[in-house]
Amino acid sequence: MAVVHKIGGDGAGTQFVPCWSCKGPVAGRALFCHTCGAIQPPGVTDHFTRLGMAPGFDLDDEKLEKQYLGFQRVLHPDRFAAKPAKERAIAESQAVALNEAYGVLDDPLKRATYLLQMKGVISEVAEDKTVSDPALLMEAMEKREALSDAESADAIETLMANEAASAIQCLSDISRAFADDDLEAANRAVLRLKYSRKLLEEARLKRAALES
């Protein structure tokens, strides 16, 4: 087991772990050893921290992409082509962790679900369970029936426009709920967004089938 040293008199501060290569101290979130320069394995950290973003639902999309692309360049396989097999494997694991983090944070639904998990709320979205909210289930059923009854591309387009507006409203509701630290409201809005996305995808498929 790696020994963790924490710098900071009050228990806060930077955590250091031994470098796998030279055993020198390495900041827990550092990509490379400060002493020997060896790339370090991805530590146990949240997706926001991994990408250098402050935890929260409202993110600067341009900054998120810039951070991601910057780390991607640092972890590009060409940079490690001449390194030993272990370093190449570690670089690959870092890239996998980076891609996973970006995949979550770049998607508002996944980001909101992940943020709820960080706050101790396991949404039905995360567990892919049937939603237990009767009102939401009824609303979803009614919308799917309306889609089933739609017999023209124009009717489907109208339904999609209405649902796209609902999805945008869900994003606004999620943002406000997290700002107010109302996790119950955030979870409800996340579930509504899940159903909106599912309906929109089904509508796109039906429209494509009609037009083919």
State where each predicted segment sits.
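C-terminal accessory/regulatory regions appended to core domains
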Residues: 1-212
